């Protein structure tokens, strides 16, 4: 039996003010063929999973907190206990709009890394409305900071 214990997974911090801890896949001791899963903590007041897309379909489950979810041309507020289905290749973004951390579980399939992790760390994330489709009207701005930027 293989067990991944969240308290023993350091995870990775991203410029958009979030911590991602892989529970299945990545640095986790658990690896699956058909899906990857992890825990994400978005810092209060703007922590974000920036506007991106990927080949895999995905689910975000909000464990606690309040966020603005953008999916394609749609924008909605999501909160504790809600799940969002993200179809393959559709651009999406989740921003913490609350004053407390937002925690969510992601699950996507098939398993594997997704390009936006590396792009964000390299500062090469496609920018909304330039290299990527625009965000929905009135959405929180996409974070495209590079590691070390203090902006």
Where are these regions (language model features)?
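A short, N-terminal "cap"/entry segment at the start of jelly-roll beta-barrel domains
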Residues: 1-35, 50, 118-151
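A generic "binding-loop/recognition-motif" signal
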Residues: 19, 55-56, 74, 90-91, ...
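Short hydrophobic/aromatic-rich beta-strand segments that constitute the beta-sheet cores
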Residues: 21, 69-71, 104
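Short, conserved beta-strand element in jelly-roll/cupin
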Residues: 34, 39-44, 53-69, 107
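A short hydrophobic beta-strand segment most commonly corresponding to one strand
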Residues: 40, 59, 85, 100-115
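Structural motif
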Residues: 46, 59, 66-68, 75, ...
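Short beta-strand His + acidic residue motifs that chelate non-heme Fe in jelly-roll/DSBH
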Residues: 49-51, 69-70, 86, 92-98
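Short acidic-glycine-tyrosine-enriched beta hairpin
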Residues: 73-88
């Amino acid at each position: 039996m293989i067990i991944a214990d969240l308290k023993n997974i350091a995870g990775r911090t991203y410029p958009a003010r979030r911590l991602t801890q892989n529970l299945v896949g990545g640095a986790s001791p658990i690896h699956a063929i058909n899906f990857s899963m992890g825990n994400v903590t978005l810092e209060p007041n703007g922590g974000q999973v920036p506007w991106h897309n990927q080949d895999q379909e995905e689910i975000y489950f909000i464990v606690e907190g309040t966020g603005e979810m953008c999916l394609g041309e749609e924008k909605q507020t999501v909160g504790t206990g809600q799940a969002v289905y993200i179809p393959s290749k559709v651009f999406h973004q989740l921003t913490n709009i609350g004053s407390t951390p937002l925690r969510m579980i992601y699950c996507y399939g098939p398993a594997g890394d997704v390009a936006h992790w590396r792009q964000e760390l390299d500062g090469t994330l496609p920018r909304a409305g330039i290299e990527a489709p625009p965000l929905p009207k009135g959405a929180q701005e996409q974070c495209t900071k590079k590691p070390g930027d203090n902006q």
